[in-house]
């Protein structure tokens, strides 16, 4: 029997709004400049990067103990309908968050701009394609703990992942992420949250 998220994903949203690291160092700009206030996403508090593995970073919010591994895309492809406008967005990312001593991480995609609630995003790896049907503002999730497990297992066995989505103004886009360092970052996030002891 599936366990469906209701409260958990709302908590996830609140935690990540405040906690997720803005990963902007050492990268080229993959999206339009939103510095003039045109971005639809909220401002994000920057937390220190505790460890880095390949394209993945590990951070923690000391106020509530939440830990996460996250990565920004390598590149973005857009498919814009006529007069849809440019894709103006904050830094997009995919993340796996550990909160409330839950050993099953919660996967999320932050598009950096508001997503169309009528069009599910999708995550594609070399293993499978999984829908991200739970949409709230610029976030997209899977529905259940079992789906999170499938996503994480698929990411762990792949080299790259693509998230395809549609924004509220009709722009379709695909973000490509490298999974180099994903397994190591996931392990370190668990260690940081006290969910895993590598010395025992």
Identify the role of each PLM range:
Residues 11, 28-29, 39:
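Compositionally biased regions
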Residues 2-3, 27:
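General N-terminal leader/first-domain-start detector
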């Amino acid at each position: 029997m599936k366990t469906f998220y209701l409260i958990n994903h709302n908590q996830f949203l609140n935690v990540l709004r405040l906690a997720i690291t803005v990963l902007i160092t050492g990268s080229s700009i993959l999206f339009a400049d939103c510095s003039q206030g045109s971005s639809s996403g909220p401002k994000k508090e920057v937390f220190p990067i505790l460890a880095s593995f390949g394209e993945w970073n590990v951070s923690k919010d000391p106020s509530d103990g939440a830990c996460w591994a996250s990565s920004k895309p390598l590149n973005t492809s857009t498919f814009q309908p006529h007069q849809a406008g440019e894709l103006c967005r904050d830094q997009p990312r995919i993340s796996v968050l550990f909160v409330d001593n839950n050993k099953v991480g919660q996967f999320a995609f932050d598009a950096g701009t508001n997503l169309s609630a009528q069009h599910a995003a999708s995550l594609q790896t070399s293993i499978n394609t999984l829908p991200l049907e739970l949409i709230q503002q610029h976030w997209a999730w899977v529905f259940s703990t079992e789906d999170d497990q499938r996503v994480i297992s698929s990411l762990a066995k792949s080299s790259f992942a693509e998230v395809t989505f549609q924004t509220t103004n009709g722009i379709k886009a695909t973000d490509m992420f490298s999974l180099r360092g994903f397994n190591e970052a996931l392990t370190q996030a668990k260690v940081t949250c006290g969910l895993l002891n590598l010395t025992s």
